[in-house]
């Protein structure tokens, strides 16, 4: 498993976009989100991009991965610890975007653990 810290105690009252992770092949992953001091319900978007993995950085559009629990494109950060996992992920690129929505305080940390398959 590879482990990457994507956000480390960043402000939850402004938009945050993580660095892109080049996964390059079929992947299983888990995202761990820790929050502290939120006074609203920020929205977390897990996004993929199918730009060629040989590119130094992705081009083209980022597409949100649907939250299958409620058929929207985001996950509401309404708890202090949240884990989201995906099996058989096939996009080349991965990133996380957090929108503050109605939140004006607190911090967010996000880490990613993933395993690739040939």
Predicted features and spans:
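Short, intrinsically disordered N-terminal pre-domain segments
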Residues: 1-14, 113-118
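Short Trp-Ser/Thr-centered turn/loop motifs at beta-strand boundaries
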Residues: 11-23, 49
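Exposed aromatic-hydrophobic patches
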Residues: 17-21, 79-87
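Aromatic, loop-rich ligand-recognition surfaces of beta-strand-rich domains
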Residues: 19-42
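Noncatalytic modules at the cell exterior or secretory-pathway interfaces
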Residues: 25-33, 86-107
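Residue-level recognition of conserved beta-strand positions in structured domain cores
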Residues: 33, 46-48, 98, 112
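Non-cytosolic beta-sandwich-type ligand-binding/adhesion modules
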Residues: 35-80
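Short, low-complexity N-terminal tether/leader segments at secretion or assembly junctions of large
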Residues: 66-69, 104-118
